[in-house]
Swiss-Prot record:
It comes from the Bacteria. Thiamine diphosphate binds at E29, L58, A59, E60, Q82, F86, I87, M88, P89. GO terms for molecular function: 3-methyl-2-oxobutanoate dehydrogenase (2-methylpropanoyl-transferring) activity. It catalyses: N(6)-[(R)-lipoyl]-L-lysyl-[protein] + 3-methyl-2-oxobutanoate + H(+) = N(6)-[(R)-S(8)-2-methylpropanoyldihydrolipoyl]-L-lysyl-[protein] + CO2. SMART domains: Transket_pyr. Its EC number is 1.2.4.4. Substrate binds at F83, A84, D85, F86, H129. This is 2-oxoisovalerate dehydrogenase subunit beta. Heterotetramer of two alpha and two beta chains. Directly associated with ODBA in the E1 complex. It is an enzyme of class 1 (oxidoreductase). One of its GO terms (biological process) is branched-chain amino acid catabolic process.
Length: 327
């Protein structure tokens, strides 16, 4: 077991899956010789060649469409959108085609495509390089949406996504790429899509979150532990479909629940999590469900001070946790 960065774990997962299965190939903008703008595909072109690591035009609808067609033909495409913000031209392909192929063909066709995309702010990317788009797709049966927080989870879940028989959107927080490091087993392992993970056991309050915010919650929990407040931290890992059993269990355990997302609040993944808790845990709650999210404004600002105001961070999570604990 070695320690590696979040992005290296993603790169390794693709490499191992391409070695394991000749049907797996990568396509996207600058994924070839350049290795991707974040170097997520570095070294793949040199090892597998241009037939399996394909540079594409700047046309996200084409990237998705070609990948969907290849998946229906029996291949295992990993289609990279350079930034999650740019996935919008491909929405019709993903929602109208990939998500519905199995249903409308009465199981005659499947679409085992993985669409990877870096999301999130904190890197001064402003309007078109900082968005969180997961909620746009999170009411489309037929899709799965995975958003890992650690290198270990990233590798295991990406492998699972490649082997899945249906389309998977795999969103990676770009700020986590080199910031987050962790132990990753050398052996071949997969993690189940659709299952949350308890990252920290606690008894006083529950924090449910995903992606980079998991690390903020863990940092805040360590601070609160010194004051005798025990936080239970749950990482959703898959944001669609949600692990309802894990959500209900975590909410019922403490009776005080904080939901954290970098996305804007209204209509977010956490809105659905709150609905699940309200429907199933109402009489187990000792406080109103609390949400911490980005402000409901059109886009992430560019100015560093304004970006900081928008972003969730450990201090904001800690303050929200303290307020909830004191209720």
């Amino acid at each position: 077991m070695s320690v590696m960065s979040y992005i290296d774990a993603i790169n390794l997962a693709m490499k191992e899956e391409m070695e394991r299965d000749s049907r797996v190939f990568v396509l996207g903008e600058d994924v070839g010789r350049k290795g991707g703008v974040f170097k997520a595909t570095a070294g793949l072109y040199e090892q597998f060649g241009e037939e399996r690591v394909m540079d594409t035009p700047l046309a996200e609808s084409a990237i998705a469409g070609v990948g969907i067609g290849a998946a229906m033909y029996g291949m295992r495409p990993i289609a990279e959108m350079q930034f999650a913000d740019f996935i919008m031209p491909a929405v019709n392909q993903i929602i109208s085609e990939a998500a519905k192929i199995r249903y409308r063909s009465n199981n005659d066709w499947s679409c085992p495509i993985v669409v990877r995309a870096p999301y999130g702010g904190g890197v001064h990317g402003a309007l078109y390089h900082s968005q969180s788009v997961e909620a746009i797709f999170a009411n489309q049966p037929g899709l799965k949406i995975v958003m890992p927080s650690t290198p270990y989870d990233a590798k295991g879940l990406l492998k699972a996504a490649v082997r899945d028989e249906d389309p998977v959107l795999f969103f990676e927080h770009k700020r986590a790429y080199r910031l987050i490091k962790g132990e990753v087993p050398a052996d071949d392992y997969v993690l189940p899509i659709g299952k949350a993970d308890v990252k920290r056991e606690g008894d006083d309050i529950t924090v449910i979150t995903y992606g980079l915010c998991v690390h903020f919650a863990l940092q805040a929990a360590e601070r609160l532990e010194k004051d005798g407040i025990s936080a239970h931290v749950v990482d959703l890992r898959t944001v669609y479909p949600l692990d309802k059993e894990a959500i209900i269990e975590a909410a019922s355990k403490t009776g005080k629940v904080l939901l954290v997302t970098e996305d804007t609040k209204e209509g977010s993944i956490m809105s659905e999590v709150a609905a699940i808790i309200s429907e199933h845990c109402l009489f187990d709650l000792d406080a109103p469900i609390k949400r911490l999210a980005g402000p409901d404004i059109p886009a992430m600002p560019y100015a560093p001070t304004m970006e900081k105001y928008f972003m969730v961070n450990p201090d904001k999570v800690e303050a929200a946790m303290r307020e909830l604990a004191e209720f």
